[in-house]
Regions:
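Glycine-rich N-terminal segment of FAD-binding domains in flavoprotein oxidoreductases
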Residues: 32, 43-105
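Loop/turn elements at helix/coil->beta-strand transitions in domains of secreted/extracellular proteins
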Residues: 23-25, 50, 72-77, 94-96, ...
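Conserved oxyanion/phosphate-binding beta-strand-loop segments in alpha/beta enzyme cores
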Residues: 17-42
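TerminUS-proximal long segments
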Residues: 437, 450-526
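Structural signature of FAD isoalloxazine-binding scaffolds in flavoprotein oxidoreductases
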Residues: 56, 87-105, 161-181, 216-219, ...
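Glycine-/small-residue-rich beta-strand-loop submotif within the FAD-binding core of flavoenzymes
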Residues: 42-46, 61, 90-122, 160, ...
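Hydrophobic, small-residue-rich alpha-helical packing segments that form membrane-like cores
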Residues: 107-112, 124-181, 188-189, 193
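C-terminal cap/substrate-recognition region of VAO/PCMH-type FAD-linked oxidoreductases
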Residues: 189-477, 484
Length: 526
């Protein structure tokens, strides 16, 4: 359970005492019985996170001290909050230090800055419960309740309310970051969205620049732009009182290739026509899940889950109209879900994030791409061909097409580091399996699948009329591998596009020694 407190603020620029002495945080080394517990708190069994030392922190001062100790000891620094990264950015340095942020999960209101404060170790589930039950507000974050805000917000953050309220970073007022200067001195800096703030560029870099780049984020302050007054209930979005939903399903046996093309075109057309910032259709969020075909077909091989804001008949009518459009000419089995309270739908009683500790997925690989419009017919055929011949060793092979756009697209691309501001869908490609002996074959299948979908643009979603790069919160080191990215477009342009040069300048200013680095980290400007 998150720790909810009253007002508090850490002094800006707090500095740890220099030297190699042990910091105040708990230091956990191999051989300590706590080490194995910390090492296993990752979400992907493909990766090993066995550093020289874990530092379990409980305050900004302890983070400053832990970073200073690592710098003075010459050890690489990694940061982990929820441990959901799709790549092994945290475990890249076996001789390094992993700073574990899960002990910093307080949520409170700061009256001086008129903003709600979230510590980095707070899970989305804790945030949703606390914000809503305390003040009746929320943030438009993701569905996985065990994700911590530490990484989620830095990469942009989106979820079922984003079409109505934008990305999470669109509500970010301030961020506290422990940085290391050129002299090797660790200190905490608070940066805000105020244009006159001398640290404004550091705030901007955390509105989509991705985790592990500039320092250790300890706290976020959230307040919606233009929000007035000092009542927390008026400073962040209010979720709908209730949600109405439904599912629409097909078996692979129901959808030969021509029907699959029709379904995908229907789905894309609806999103292309209903994703402007002021469209009434933004009150609806849906996920189309396309699962790899198994030996035994399932009634839910292809499934659309939709939710709509609005009480009673209005929400149900929007979902029904959406299902009518998507199922035109292809049928499908439809089940409507009665209206229920918002928090109950978001966090059903049997879905508590504490039950998700440890490895959630087995062995896992993910890829992603933004879509400005639907896939071409050739891309749709590629998706069909790969999913209907998915190898049996995969526990799950799936493409997710998630509603996007709406208010997300009401923000200029350069206003935040999150640059993709005219897409209507996010595509995610996932594969999970259990046996480590299947690693090579499983990875190869997903990599070839993704490459073939984007074969016209060098195997990756190069920004053009259809694609718009990828999402840094779904990191994929293959984008930096010339064997899988033959486009000539570097990985950082797929994630950050025209914002990358500015991010490099921020990196040079705030992490000139490149203390915080991993396979997809931003490089300091020359």
């Amino acid at each position: 359970m998150a720790h909810v407190t009253g007002s508090a603020s850490h002094r800006e620029g707090a500095v740890a005492e220099r030297g190699g002495g042990s910091p105040a945080s708990s230091a956990v080394y191999p051989g300590d019985p706590r080490y194995e517990d910390l090492a296993l708190r990752r979400r992907n069994e493909r990766f090993v996170q066995r550093p020289a030392c874990f530092r379990v922190v409980r305050s900004t001062d302890e983070v400053v001290a832990a970073v200073q100790w690592a710098v003075d000891s010459g050890r690489p620094v990694s940061v982990r909050s929820g441990g959901h990264s799709l790549e092994n950015s945290v475990g890249e340095h076996p001789d390094g230090v992993i700073i574990d942020m899960t002990g910093m999960n307080a949520i409170h209101f700061d009256p001086d800055r008129r903003a709600v404060v979230l510590e980095s170790g707070a899970t989305l589930g804790e945030v949703y419960r606390t914000l809503y039950l305390t003040w009746g507000v929320t943030v438009p974050g993701g569905w996985c309740h065990s994700v911590c805000v530490g990484g989620h917000i830095q990469g942009g953050g989106y979820g079922s309310l984003s079409r109505t309220h934008g990305s999470v970073v669109d509500h970010l007022y301030a961020v506290e970051v422990v940085v290391v200067d050129e002299a090797g001195r660790a200190r905490a800096v608070l940066a805000t969205r105020e244009s006159g703030d001398p640290h404004h560029d550091l705030w901007w870099a955390h509105t989509g620049g991705g985790g592990g780049n500039f320092g250790v984020v300890t706290r976020y302050w959230l307040r919606s732009p233009g929000a007035e007054g000092d009542d927390p209930a008026d400073l962040l979005p209010r979720p709908p009182a209730s949600l109405t939903g439904g599912v629409l399903m097909w078996s692979w046996a129901d959808l030969p290739k021509e029907s699959f093309r029709r379904l995908m075109r229907n789905h894309a057309d609806w999103h292309e026509n209903n994703s402007d910032p002021d469209s009434p259709g933004t009150a609806l969020h849906s996920t189309l899940m396309l699962s790899g075909r198994k030996e035994q077909d399932s009634p839910a091989d292809i499934l659309i889950y939709a939710l709509a804001d609005g009480d009673g008949a209005d929400g149900a009518a929007l979902v029904e109209k959406y299902f009518d459009a998507v199922s035109d000419g292809v049928g499908g089995t439809r089940h409507m879900i009665p209206a229920a309270p918002w928090l109950y739908v978001l966090m059903p009683p049997n879905g508590d994030e504490e039950s998700q500790r440890g490895s959630e997925y087995g062995r896992y690989k993910g890829k992603a791409g933004y879509l400005r419009k639907g896939f071409s017919t050739a891309q749709v055929d590629t998706v069909f061909d790969h999913l209907t011949t998915a190898p049996p060793m995969l526990d799950m092979a799936r493409v997710w097409l998630v509603s996007y756009g709406g208010k997300v697209n009401d923000v200029a691309p350069e206003a935040t580091a999150l640059v993709q501001r005219d897409s209507v869908l996010k595509a995610a490609y996932t594969a999970t399996w259990l046996d480590p002996r299947d690693d090579e074959a499983s990875l190869d299948w997903l990599r070839r699948f993704y490459r073939d979908v984007y074969r016209e643009t060098g195997g990756v979603p190069v920004p053009d009329g259809t694609n718009d790069g990828s999402y840094i919160n779904y990191p994929d080191t293959d984008l930096a591998d010339p064997d899988w990215n033959t486009s000539g477009v570097p990985w950082h342009d797929l994630y950050y596009k025209q914002n990358y040069p500015r991010l490099r300048r921020v990196k040079k200013r705030w992490d000139p020694r490149n203390v915080f680095r991993h396979a997809l980290s931003i490089q300091p400007a020359d």
